[in-house]
Amino acid sequence: MLNILNKKIIMPSAKIFGENYTVEVVYKKISNPELNLCGKIIMVYLPTKYKRTGDTGILRLALEKMYDEIARIEIENVMEETRIMLNGLAPENYVIKRIPNKLAKTLANKTIVINPEIVKYDKEILRYVILHEFCHLKYKNHTKKFWEMIEKYMPYYEQYELVA
C-alpha cells in the first residue's frame, strides 16, 4: 500500500541483506529515475510524468535495477571468496537473472544462475547459496558427500537451508 504525503510516496519498506529500508519517492523534473541510499532510506526520484499517470510500475522497475546493481557487486565478491575458499573450484560462467521460485541454480554446462532478489536476504544466505551451487559443480546431486562438502566450509549451513 502506498501513502501519499505532499510530493512523496512512502512504501512500507524494501529489504537489502535482511534489513528493512524505508522507500521514499519524490517526483522531480528529470528524464530518468534516480536512486540514492541515505542511511536506512532509499530515495527514489522519478520523472514528474509518472505522478500524473499514477504509474507505480516505474517504482518497481527502479527498485529492481537497484537490486540488480547490488547483486552484481556483492555476488561477484562472494563468488571470488568462495572460489578462493574452495581452492580454485569455480563455474564456467555465472549469470545474474530473475528465476521464478529459486534463488540460484547450476546448469549442466556448469553455469551458475543467481536471482538478484537474493540481496533481499541476509548476506550469510547469499554465501550459503553460492557455496551450495559451487558444491554442485563437484557433486550434481544432494548426496552425502555433497552435504559433507557444504558442512566442511559452512558447519552451520542448516540454519539457511530452509530459507534458501
Regions from the language model: what does each represent?
Residues 1-127, 137-164:
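Active-site-proximal or metal-binding-adjacent scaffold patches in catalytic folds
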Residues 130:
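Walker B beta-strand of ABC/ABC-like P-loop ATPase nucleotide-binding domains
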Residues 133:
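Walker B catalytic acidic pair
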